Amino acid sequence: MKKILLAGAISALAAPLAAQSFKEWQDPEINAVNRAPMRSEAFAFRKGENGTSKTDRQNSSNYLSLKGDWKFNWVNDASSRPTDFWKKDFNDKGWDTIKVPGIWELNGYGDPIYVNTGYAWRNHFSSNPPEVPTADNHVGTYRREILVPASWKGKEIFAHFGSVTSNIYLWVNGKYVGYSEDSKLEAEFDLTPYLIPGKENLICFQVFRWCDGSYLEDQDFWRLSGVGRDCYLFARDKNRIADIRVTPDLTDNYTDGVLDIDLTLTANKPVTLTLTDAAGNTVATGSASKSGKTTMSVSNPNKWTAETPYLYTLTATMDGSDEVIPVKVGFRKIELKGNQILVNG
């Protein structure tokens, strides 16, 4: 019995320590922890919302913006970063405030650096992959409470970070959620087990100026850190279209069109696919009942060109769900023939 109690005490002590001592930022074998699978950028609206664009999604009941003021702490050296900021009783009253999205160097935290070739640390650190400097490796730490709609109860809730440089560690309500690198890619996390709809929820994350992934991000550009793109929460039905990838093409000597549609479903339920033109007229329909590929044919569609960028809207819905996923598509064919790149022949 004493051994059991001792083991329990050790485990209780180890849990918070484990949440503060991550090494992913210098581990080349790990570029994500608990990150949701990458997917196409399609947003699920509710029936009747009629959204089709990034701007429209902000008016959807499935969307909750994370833009705005966040409590913010910035340190010059990674060794000086706070390690217990994710605790619910942490006192952040002495912290600054920063806008999200927001680049540190454009808000007075560090200096923007332009590098054509090589790495921004080259004057004070000898490259030794996967290790990156601790000194001058700035770290920004964010905290904010977010009221999650009570109407999201029973939904699956995700966080979307459009671009965070160079990485992100994420906590919700005092619990570690996950990690992501790949700073110019979107990172999404399933927050369903951590959030409480109808209540204020504490979201915390920490960002390093450099991580091991920075060795692969040494292109000719300004080196800037922080949150560079839109961030938000979004709600989804449990039974849903998790991903839809649409590839348009032209056939029959560039006359007719075909859509190759790749669906990822969380449940094998019928899916209805409807293609409408710019005036809202239905021009083709299709269906699917499981994850995988399907096709839709369109007779003599309007072609997409740079001069006439005509777009159709493909709408996908699943039986038993009031989610509507619109995808803009244009029919074109790009080919390399001889020494020329041809569009639509």
Can you name each region flagged by the protein language model?
Residues 245, 315-344:
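N-terminal carbohydrate-binding accessory modules
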Residues 202-205, 308-319:
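Short, aromatic- and glycine-rich surface loops/edge beta-strands on solvent-exposed regions
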Residues 1-22:
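Bacterial Sec-dependent N-terminal signal peptides
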Residues 23-34, 52, 56, 71-75, ...:
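Accessory beta-strand-rich segments of carbohydrate-active enzymes
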Residues 170-172, 256-288, 294:
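Beta-strand-rich binding/interaction modules
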Residues 171-177, 278, 319, 344-345:
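Short strand-turn-strand beta-turns centered on an Asx-Gly dipeptide
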Residues 152-155, 195-200, 297-311:
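Short glycine/proline/serine/threonine-rich loop/turn segments at secondary-structure transition edges
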Residues 238-267:
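Surface beta-strand/loop "capping" patches
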